[in-house]
A protein has these predicted regions:
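Positively charged, small/polar-rich N-terminal and surface patches that mediate targeting and assembly
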Residues: 1-97
């Protein structure tokens, strides 16, 4: 079964996230850059003077076992980088057209 892994992360760690993707041998993804958000650990990122910084999103469609490996890699990166902020959300894919 295919899963959609959505990874939300601080744009400051983009290089580390892309290295993580490479180590997981994941070459196909969709990246959305410069999104705004608020996280419990990393705080608010609205791209302005009061709340500087932005987030990026990666959408990765992958088999379930690879999605679990990617989630583990995200947890490891979060433990390493701390407050910079990264989270993974795993959703089922019903259909690809």
């Amino acid at each position: 079964m295919l899963k959609m892994v959505i990874i939300a992360y601080n744009e400051a760690i983009d290089m580390e996230v892309m290295e993580m993707m490479e180590k997981c041998d994941l070459k196909n993804y969709t990246k959305v850059m410069g999104v705004f958000g608020r996280g419990e650990t990393s705080g608010t990122h609205l791209g302005n003077d009061i709340w500087p910084g932005r987030n990026n999103l990666l959408y990765v469609a992958t088999p379930e076992n690879t999605a679990k490996q990617l989630a583990s890699a995200v947890k490891e990166l979060r433990a390493k980088l701390g407050k910079e902020g990264i989270k993974a959300f795993i959703l089922p894919i019903e259909e690809i057209t």
